[in-house]
Amino acid sequence: MIDTDGFRPNVGIILADGSGRVLWARRVGGQDAWQFPQGGIKESESAEQALYRELQEEVGLKAEDVEILAVTQGWLRYRLPQKLVRQKEPRCVGQKQKWFLLKMLAEDSAVDLIGGGPPEFDEWRWVSYWYPLSKVVSFKREVYRRALKELVAPHNSLLSGLPLVDGESLC
C-alpha cells in the first residue's frame, strides 16, 4: 500500500528497557547496518496492529511483553536514495512512519531474532537513547531525530519513575 505521493505507510519501534536503554539491531546482510525495528502497515491493519505484528516478526516479542508509552502525533517521512527507489508501479519513493515508544516488560531472553519468518536482524544490543542518531544510515537520520525528540519526555519518565502529565515528565 503506497500513498499518492509514493510513500509506504510504516511503523517504527523504539523499545526501551527499565533503564531507558533502547533496542538496536543489525540488519541481516547489511554492511554493519543497524536500526530500530520497523515495517510496513498492511491495508487491513491499524498502525498499532502493524506494530504488534512487526514486533513479533522481527524480534519475537508479543503484545504482553511490552507496554506502549507513546506514539508520534503525525507521519514522519523519509525519502529513499535514488538507487533504492522502486521504478515499477506503484512507485515507492520513501516511507511515512508512525513511531511507537515501548517499554519492555519481558526478560531479555524473550527477544528472538528468528521470530516468525526469515530473520531481518542477526544481532541486537541495548544502547543509550540518543546513540542511534549518529549511527543510523544517513537518509533515515532526520526521521530518527524527530521521533526521538518527540518521544523523549515519555522516555524520560522511565528514568524518573514518575507518570506523565500532558506529555511532560513531572521532574
Swiss-Prot record:
GO MF terms, alphabetically ordered: metal ion binding; pyrophosphatase activity
Gene3D superfamilies: Nucleoside Triphosphate Pyrophosphohydrolase
Keywords tagged on the record: Hydrolase, Metal-binding
Stored SUPFAM superfamilies: Nudix
CDD domains: NUDIX_Ap4A_hydrolase_plant_like (cd03671)
Domain Nudix hydrolase: 6-149
Disulfide bond positions: none
InterPro entries: Nudix_hydrolase, NUDIX_hydrolase-like_dom_sf, NUDIX_hydrolase_CS, NUDIX_hydrolase_dom, RppH
EC code: 3.6.1.-
Transmembrane parts of this sequence: none
Keyword Translocase on entry: no
Nudix box, short sequence motif: residues: 39-60
Cofactors demanded by this protein: a divalent metal cation
NCBIfam families the UniProt entry points to: PRK00714.1-1, PRK00714.1-4, PRK00714.1-5
Role of this protein: Accelerates the degradation of transcripts by removing pyrophosphate from the 5'-end of triphosphorylated RNA, leading to a more labile monophosphorylated state that can stimulate subsequent ribonuclease cleavage.
The family this protein is said to belong to: Belongs to the Nudix hydrolase family. RppH subfamily.
Protein name: RNA pyrophosphohydrolase
